[in-house]
Amino acid sequence: MSNDSVFTLVLLCTNSQYKLNNFKLIMDDVVVIGGGIIGAATAYFLSKEGRKVKVIERDPTYKTASFPLSLGGFRRQFFQKENILLGKFAREFIFQIPDLLKTEKNPNPTASMVTNGYLLMFGPEHAEEQYRALENHKECEAGTKNIKGSELSKIFPYINSEGIETATYTDNQSEGWIDPFMFHSALKSKAIELGAEFIKGEVKSISEIKAKTIVSAAGCWTKELLEDIPVVPQKHTVFRVKCPKYIKEMPLTGD
């Protein structure tokens, strides 16, 4: 089992009719279905390249969206080299948010970045795969350190290392977490300044849209539009607990 996180962007072309809430629109260039973090990022990067982008989002408050519930972690500790390199790109982009996403309305964008690193721990059943992943980390210059389970509590005295075979850690400000809602707001604001248009509406069928390029950024709701695409919801749970002692330097930790 890989520790890689995967998201899917689906690109389609169609010449069919587009209707939204009984209001006909003609889309000349790019339509993005879904205005969450992937949709906003797609709008930003394509608008930056001069594309005419329209984003359709059924809930502009994002009350039921996935991204506001995220821990907002950014990392390069993946198995696949492509994901490692994307993680490195993400880190550099996040560090440049004040410059890249600055707008007239939001001259000081931020995502409240915390660079405490990532600490990922593995039991014996997953250790061998992680050793292989470390080879990819090394090739991609990810800056990942390997820590034996027996040494873990010496570095992190608050961790019970029982059952831990190995762990990987970064302490070079290359990993950490951000506020996903603030990041989304900055991306969306910049995309709009670059010419992207965000429209409230719900797409029931791809055939409703007429555009040169359609991008599905519907996340776990993709299957409602594209039944043949193997994207299914996967439930993750975050528990918030009160620690007896606040540990300011604690990394984002996964077991």
State each model region's role.
Residues 28, 207-213:
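Core beta-strand elements of the Rossmann-like FAD/NAD(P) dinucleotide-binding domain
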Residues 30-54:
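N-terminal Rossmann-like FAD-binding beta1-loop-alpha1 element of flavoenzymes
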Residues 38, 61, 221:
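Conserved Rossmann-like nucleotide-cofactor binding loop
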Residues 41, 89-92, 97, 101-105, ...:
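Flavin-dependent oxidoreductases
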Residues 71-155:
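Dinucleotide-binding Rossmann-like beta1-alpha1 core, especially the glycine-rich loop
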Residues 96, 121-200:
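Flavin (FAD/FMN) cofactor-binding and adjacent substrate-gating region
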